[in-house]
Amino acid sequence: MPVAARHLIAAILLSLACPGCDSQTRDFRHQFYAFGTLLTIDFLDVTESTSAAAIAAVETRISKIDRNWYPWSTRAGVPFGEIAEINDAIAAGQPIAVSPVLAALIRRAALLESQTGGRFNPAIGRLTELWGFHDLARLRAAPPDGIEIQKWVAGRASSEYLEWNGNVLRSNSPDVMLDLGGIAKGSILEQFVTILRENGVDNAIIDIGGDLTVVGTVSGRPARIGIRSPRTDDVLAWLEVAGGEAVMTSGDYERFFEYQGKRYQHVLDPRSGYPVQHTVSATVVHADAVLADAAATALLVAGPDGFDRLCADLGLDVALIVTVSGDVRLTRGMEKRLHWKWR
């Protein structure tokens, strides 16, 4: 139901404590810069050796993912990766063998495109490139030519044009270019949870640029997530998140440029070829981090008119969006969990 409010953007404000930790264990915070953002892992009530072993394994995985999941062929200091090789093969109309982990993720992305009615589209790479959002160091100063945008839309790039023979992939559509940015964080969070569990970590919070997942509990309680104003650090509401749940947010504050007083954000509507304008933020809480990641993007594209239907189609119980006018639309599950600061 819509609720009048100031502009909100879901963000993560963590309050961590560990009273009663014994002398052998304590809390550790490790931070890295990876995937173009800040990655923070808060280990709760662990030994130093346990956290160190987990971090070493995470760093190894980061290096592999950062290299292999970048969709474009050139990036300073980064070797040619697997998704870039796949995109080059698709452009050439050639088949290519795909690693099992990435093949499973691409198949999942294609299913999510179908389930969201194309609002999430993993084949949108050329449009992302056209708008310049693939290179944060060189964002555009102005929108691309409208003719080029319409040409991309007319090409109907979609994962439905991917053809599989086992784990060998090909496509007869040269307009298809894979960009898994809309689900990558969700998959990475799930992989990191597995790594932490394998290394004996029972309680932690993993945060990748504001998208997070909770492992276990915080001092025996659910984690508290703050929703704050986009222009200040004021906390407007609190949300409790249980162990095993992920909180994924998509918003117009992550990557954008301004032209003639108008903001152009990185979340693009595949149906029009243009950045989303009606909605500034979408947040989804779900045990399936990949689903939550794609759903946050799809809800941002769907906007207030498509919010209820898409939540029903995807089985989302805890979700909200914030419109450009500052209204909040949320599911009943989200409404029950939120604790408004002013109430």
Please report, for each region that a protein language model flagged, where it lies by residue.
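Mature catalytic core of soluble alpha/beta enzymes
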Residues: 2-9, 14-343
